[in-house]
């Protein structure tokens, strides 16, 4: 009886840990509107992104653009039209594919 109770407690604890790691906000990225020129180091990019109300920013590896990041919020996606969402996702996908293609060569 004691062993099954101990096993049950362990199973519940393990399940809680696995679930906690899965519940993570997706990170949304967008190019900075205020950062001028080519992005070389993170601090100026991060400063520009924070001034634009994002949580962080970094330079893209290949295209050297300043990308601002923040946790995705469901409500923001609902306020945009389908065409706007598709256009943003297409730009992000195109940049990711270009970087991947360049890295593979």
Swiss-Prot record:
PROSITE patterns: GAMMA_THIONIN
Tissue expression: Most abundant in the epidermal cell layers of the petals and sepals, within the connective cells of the anthers, and the cortical cells of the style. Not detected in the tapetum, pollen mother cells, the transmitting tissue, the vascular bundles of the anther and style or in leaves. Expressed also in ovaries, but barley detectable in roots.
KW Thylakoid (keyword) present: no
Cross-referenced InterPro entries: Defensin_plant, Scorpion_toxin-like, Scorpion_toxin-like_sf
Temperature dependence: Stable under extremes of temperature.
Principal subcellular localisation of the protein: secreted
CDD domains (alphabetical): Knot1 (cd00107)
Cystines in this chain: 28-72, 39-59, 45-66, 49-68
Keywords: Antimicrobial, Disulfide bond, Fungicide, Plant defense, Secreted, Signal, Vacuole
Cleaved propeptide residues: 73-105
Top-rank taxon, per record: Eukaryota
SUPFAM superfamilies documented for this protein: Scorpion toxin-like (SSF57095)
Signal peptide coordinates: 1-25
Presence of the UniProt keyword Transmembrane helix in the record: no
Entries under Pfam families matching the protein: Gamma-thionin (PF00304)
Family indicated by similarity: Belongs to the DEFL family.
Protein name: Flower-specific defensin
